[in-house]
Amino acid sequence: MSPSIHKCKAGFLWSPELETFDFGSKHPIRVGRFQMVRDFLQETRFLEHPNVKIIKPKPLARSLLSRIHSQEYLEKVRKISETGKGEIDIDTPGFKGIYNNARITSGATVTGVEAIHSKKVCHTYSPTGGFHHARYETGGGFCIFNDVAASVYRLKDLGYERILIADFDVHHGNGTQAYFYDDSGVMQISFHEDPEWIYPHDGFIEDIGEGEGLGYNINMHFPMDSGDEVYRYAFDRIVPPLFNFYQPDFILFLPGFDAHYDDPMTHLNLTMNTIRYVTEEIHAAAHRWASGRLSVISGGGYNREVFRYGAGVVMSVLTGAVFNPPTQTPPFEDDDEIWAVVKENTQKVQDLVFSALGI
């Protein structure tokens, strides 16, 4: 039986070690990002909630590192870490200590899933993680080590057979997709902006997996300026049937703070209302199918106020505590052209994926 939604303990992953990074003063990922979330949750009294437990993250185990990344790539990161010179890719500069920082920021996610497995908590929220662009042979897109892939491997070791990744980050998780593209033991659902307009320029609807994984890789992408109504239209027609079919025993969730209309690096038009809606639906699905086992990983989000409010919304859903961010009015409404594209894309996902799975 799933624990009661109101009695379920939520773990918050926190340690000052998470802040030991420096991509540079002009980089979108700035020092203080994770401390900011922790301070906001302290100010709003979420961290004093009786159902919240602070969990100190452990560095990502070297045994997991060697499974998710090549030795050549790990050696490259070590050398950059020692000298402070070099880069992971053009958007991801190196710095002294990057190897150990990446181990702790990615290790936070794995620490969280282990805490859920051991029943210390049934949900976790990490202000870091969601490094879904890192691939076996390289990092990129602000991502060094792929914590999502590492968590899946750890969960498989612990005996989980139906792991669902619900990735609502506005950028497609190309790295994570590559790890499990032929694996029916992992279902990946990604809602993201049209790859034509945004990094990493992949994650097309036609990419539905292969071999044993055919139909288990789901990509739904949205045109620029898509807002709350079209997003929920697609969500309601795609996501619940997939959950009902797959009946996951563990859920990893990236809530997509960077899909907000005020994010400076992206082009969707969502408000906190939809981020809350998606979080509530995923949370309810975790209790229905996975005995509450839900790991929430912040992922992207480059407006600091939005990132704070997103963290508050997540913790509100996980704990049942009240949190109401300011009323928000996006600059655009969903027009007829956006509606036409989203309806067509939604139907295409249903035609390709549902037929492959027999839904």
Where are these regions (language model features)?
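N-terminal low-complexity, Ser/Thr- and acidic-residue-enriched intrinsically disordered segments
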Residues: 1-63
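A general "terminal functional-core" signal
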Residues: 2-13, 19, 75-359
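Generic structural signal for well-ordered secondary structure
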Residues: 30, 34, 58, 66-70, ...
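A broadly tuned "polar low-complexity/structure-edge" signature
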Residues: 35, 66-67, 136, 148
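Short glycine-centered helix-capping/turn motifs at secondary-structure transition points
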Residues: 44-50, 72, 119, 159
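Charged, often glycine-rich, active-site loop that binds/positions anionic groups
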Residues: 57-82
